[in-house]
């Protein structure tokens, strides 16, 4: 996998790489839009799978081979399948769910404008020149120290950053996931009066004399069960003699 990303960089340069980038990004954008536009909840769960597959292709083009392989495993194998199981547990009908979409249009428009404003703000900060004099920096002398340092793989770099600089945030995210898991269990553990349940302790504590079942054997060799019950709820007085007589 380490040789896969450089191969993509070598073979796909210029127009070819831009074409592949457009081919992978366009279905991702359309699928992301269909996640919120699909009226069938099952389709809304299946569209993110296509988004994650396209995202893996984009990560391979960027040279992040480890992230490209771990993204489908985590997102498709865990999150998307979990969402699909939740939809199946809710017993949602396959028929399309009619809902007023325009009622959420103002809120979604405001969130979209905030998102685009943040994106333009980030891009403006990225285009700030390195020197305040705005001179041409191509004639400056510099030394590339990247080749003199031992190169790390994507996995080593990710592990070094995750468990050193971002260790606190890693623990916070794990606690958030733990709270979410416990909360999902607590939400499903609710009692309702519509379900018929049986009190096992009370059932076992009933008087066994009212449920005596005696197997008797007839003289002709046929076996049958005979249930004894008296008017007071107990067995008759002569059930022992009857059992001895058939034996």
UniProtKB/Swiss-Prot annotation:
<comment type="function">
    <text>Core subunit of the mitochondrial membrane respiratory chain NADH dehydrogenase (Complex I) that is believed to belong to the minimal assembly required for catalysis. Complex I functions in the transfer of electrons from NADH to the respiratory chain. The immediate electron acceptor for the enzyme is believed to be ubiquinone.</text>
</comment>
<keyword id="KW-0249">Electron transport</keyword>
<dbReference type="InterPro" id="IPR042106">
    <property type="entry name" value="Nuo/plastoQ_OxRdtase_6_NuoJ"/>
</dbReference>
<feature type="transmembrane region" description="Helical">
    <location>
        <begin position="70"/>
        <end position="90"/>
    </location>
</feature>
<protein>
    <recommendedName>
        <fullName>NADH-ubiquinone oxidoreductase chain 6</fullName>
        <ecNumber>7.1.1.2</ecNumber>
    </recommendedName>
</protein>
<feature type="transmembrane region" description="Helical">
    <location>
        <begin position="44"/>
        <end position="64"/>
    </location>
</feature>
<feature type="transmembrane region" description="Helical">
    <location>
        <begin position="18"/>
        <end position="38"/>
    </location>
</feature>
<keyword id="KW-0812">Transmembrane</keyword>
<dbReference type="Pfam" id="PF00499">
    <property type="entry name" value="Oxidored_q3"/>
</dbReference>
<keyword id="KW-1133">Transmembrane helix</keyword>
<keyword id="KW-0520">NAD</keyword>
<keyword id="KW-0496">Mitochondrion</keyword>
<keyword id="KW-0813">Transport</keyword>
<dbReference type="GO" id="GO:0008137">
    <property type="term" value="F:NADH dehydrogenase (ubiquinone) activity"/>
</dbReference>
<feature type="transmembrane region" description="Helical">
    <location>
        <begin position="104"/>
        <end position="124"/>
    </location>
</feature>
<feature type="transmembrane region" description="Helical">
    <location>
        <begin position="168"/>
        <end position="188"/>
    </location>
</feature>
<keyword id="KW-0830">Ubiquinone</keyword>
<comment type="similarity">
    <text>Belongs to the complex I subunit 6 family.</text>
</comment>
<keyword id="KW-0472">Membrane</keyword>
<keyword id="KW-0679">Respiratory chain</keyword>
<keyword id="KW-1278">Translocase</keyword>
<dbReference type="InterPro" id="IPR001457">
    <property type="entry name" value="NADH_UbQ/plastoQ_OxRdtase_su6"/>
</dbReference>
<dbReference type="GO" id="GO:0031966">
    <property type="term" value="C:mitochondrial membrane"/>
</dbReference>
């Amino acid at each position: 996998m380490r040789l896969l990303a450089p191969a993509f960089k070598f073979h796909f340069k210029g127009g070819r790489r831009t074409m592949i980038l457009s081919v992978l990004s366009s279905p991702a954008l359309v699928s992301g839009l269909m996640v919120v536009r699909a009226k069938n909840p099952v389709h809304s769960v299946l569209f993110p799978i296509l988004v994650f597959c396209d995202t893996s292709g984009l990560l391979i083009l960027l040279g992040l081979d480890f992230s490209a392989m771990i993204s489908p495993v985590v997102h498709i194998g865990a999150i998307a399948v979990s969402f699909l199981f939740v939809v199946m547990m809710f017993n949602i009908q396959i028929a399309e769910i009619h809902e007023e979409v325009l009622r959420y249009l103002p809120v979604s428009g405001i969130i979209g404008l905030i998102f685009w404003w943040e994106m333009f703000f980030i891009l403006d900060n990225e285009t700030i020149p390195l020197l305040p004099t705005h001179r041409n920096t191509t004639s400056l002398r510099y030394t590339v120290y990247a080749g003199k340092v031992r190169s790390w793989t994507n996995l080593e770099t990710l592990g070094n950053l995750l468990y050193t600089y971002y260790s606190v945030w890693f623990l916070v995210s794990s606690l958030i996931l733990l709270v979410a898991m416990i909360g999902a269990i607590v939400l499903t553990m609710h009692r309702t009066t519509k379900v018929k349940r049986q009190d096992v302790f009370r059932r076992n504590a009933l008087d066994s004399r009212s449920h005596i079942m005696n197997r008797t054997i007839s003289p002709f060799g046929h076996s049958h069960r005979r249930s004894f019950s008296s008017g007071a709820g107990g067995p008759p007085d002569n059930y022992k003699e009857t059992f001895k007589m058939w034996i």
